[in-house]
Structures are given as structure tokens and as C-alpha cells.
Amino acid sequence: MEKKMPKATAKRLPVYLRYLKMLGDSGVKRIKSREFSEMIQIPSATIRRDFSHVGELGRSGYGYDVPYLIEVFSNILNTQEEKRIALIGCGNLGKALLKNNFRRNENLNIVCAFDNDSALVGTTINGLLVHDMSELEAFVRQEGVTVAISTVPSHHAQKAIDKIVQAGVTAILNFAPDRVSVPANVSVQYIDLTTELQTLIYFNETFSLANSPKQ
């Protein structure tokens, strides 16, 4: 890929790969963009544009070779390499993530968990011992951690993120919606459930108004 891939395109790649693997598991060898569009509910023009950032992946009238696309997107997303993850914050959300631990993605693995609550430190969740935050840096080195997930509330998020960065982790998924300050070499992805819900409600109500009977 010679030109930089747009962020919106990059965010859709895991979706494409997930559905391509489903097609592959079902024995499908070839699919056209229109059929793929109907399956994943993304406009076919968007799919073709996204794929063009990767390379010449299909032929007009033929469609896309499913096994080949799986190989291409797997290589781009580096799914063959295990990503060892540290979870910071073992409250209700943290516990849910530990219990799930990305069962559908073999290369994503939470290998250590941390909290500063003495009531949680020393307990075991889904086979993982919860450690004190003071041990984070040592475990990052010991376990080869490259990614961190923070479920720490907004008012404590910056302090938690600072410790994650200090430990040497440069990829962070943050469940606190407020933006945090990080060095230029650190990537932070935010999960803001309130914003997602408000956006959903807006589009639902807008669609309902547009399709309501005229008085």
C-alpha cells in the first residue's frame, strides 16, 4: 500500500475479514461486491473504495476471490501474531472483558490484569490473578504486552494511561470517553457508549420522522 489508508477504511477491515472468514468456513470461494454489501450492510461503493486502498483485489464481472481476500486482510491486520494484552481496571466492565477474553479471536489474548482496589487485588477472574498497578511495568516486560485496555473511569483515566505509557505500551483501548494526553508515538482508541447510543437514537428518530405518514 503506497498511500496511507484512511482511518475509516482501516476501522472497517476487521469487519470485512470477519465476514470473509464466515464465507470461507461456508465453502464460498467467490463473491461480488453487491452480494458482500448486502451481507455486511455496507454500500458496495464503499467496499470497492476501501479495497482500492489495499490493491487490485477483484476483477470486473468476476468479483472477489474469498480465500485470497482472507489472506490479504489477515496479513494487513497481522492476525497470525499473538497480541498480548494488559487489562487495567477490574470493575464490572473489566470482569466482563476478562471472562470473554476475545474467544472469537485466537490472536488477541488478555494475559494480565491490574487494579488499585485492595479488595480486587489478589482475586482471580477467569483464571487471571489481579495485580496491583505498581506491578504493571514489570509485567509488561515479563509477558511481552504490546496492547492495553483501560476501563478506568474518566476522572482517574489520565493517571492510569500515564502508567500504561510509562510501562512502554503504545497501543491503548480506552473505555473512558474523555480524551487523554499521550506522547505522539502512542495510539489511543476510545470506546464511548453514550455517544454511540445518542447517535443511534438520532438516526432512528430521524428515520422515523422521514417515513411517518404525512398529515
Swiss-Prot record:
Key word Transferase present: no
GO molecular function, one term: DNA-binding transcription factor activity
Principal cellular location given in the protein's record: cytoplasm
Positions annotated to bind NAD(+): 89-94
Subcellular location field: Cytoplasm
InterPro entries in the record: CoA-bd (IPR003781), NAD(P)-bd_dom_sf (IPR036291), Rex_DNA-bd_C_dom (IPR009718), Tscrpt_rep_Rex (IPR022876), WH-like_DNA-bd_sf (IPR036388), WH_DNA-bd_sf (IPR036390)
UniProt record, GO biological process: negative regulation of DNA-templated transcription; response to redox state
UniProt DNA-binding region: 15-54
One Pfam family this sequence matches: Put_DNA-bind_N
SUPFAM superfamilies in UniProt: NAD(P)-binding Rossmann-fold domains (SSF51735), Winged helix' DNA-binding domain (SSF46785)
Keywords tagged on the record: Cytoplasm, DNA-binding, NAD, Repressor, Transcription, Transcription regulation
Record's GO cellular component terms: cytoplasm
Entry keyword annotation includes Manganese: no
SMART domains, sorted: CoA_binding
Subunit relationships: Homodimer.
Family statement: Belongs to the transcriptional regulatory Rex family.
Function in brief: Modulates transcription in response to changes in cellular NADH/NAD(+) redox state.
Protein name: Redox-sensing transcriptional repressor Rex 2
Organism, as annotated: Enterococcus faecalis (strain ATCC 700802 / V583)
Phylogenetic lineage: Bacteria, Bacillati, Bacillota, Bacilli, Lactobacillales
Gene this chain is encoded by: rex2
